[in-house]
Amino acid sequence: MYSSSRKRCPQTKWALKLLTAAFLAASPAAKSAVNNAYDALIIEARKGNTQPALSWFALKSALSNNQIADWLQIALWAGQDKQVITVYNRYRHQQLPARGYAAVAVAYRNLQQWQNSLTLWQKALSLEPQNKDYQRGQILTLADAGHYDTALVKLKQLNSGAPDKANLLAEAYIYKLAGRHQDELR
């Protein structure tokens, strides 16, 4: 290798260090390490250890839409409904994946803010109209809000495709809320 016998000024050394760091950060190995660390946080959160991921998100200023959705889901898993709504309000103008909107819908439902929840269920369903979990979430929220007949109609539509145990439980829940105890046992 060639080496220069002349000394570099501090600004040149600083610029070279910065350039080297930028090249290293852009390398596939560096990106892989960052992705592996992020994936490890998500895996831990799925196991129930949500605090490391929540702390990581709180320290970041620039997040992708998928990372925002991850934050919303993990905060929901942690039972932090108010944090879910705070994060959503901060990033509400982003185009989030459906799972992000669904997490916020559940948080609003948990806080008994039915109309806000229904609005978010509709947003999630506009992105994934065939998602049965989102359809059921909307149906249960309609029932919580006292719209029993609408909830039952939507549930019957969902059941027409393929009835399942979750739908039977949802139906019993709706009948119970509506005070129709004889129907909840069918």
Predicted regions and their residues:
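Register position in tetratricopeptide repeats
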Residues: 46, 77, 110, 144-145, ...
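N-terminal leader/linker segments that initiate helical-solenoid repeat arrays
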Residues: 23-86, 95, 99
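TPR alpha-solenoid repeat register
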Residues: 67, 100, 134, 167-168
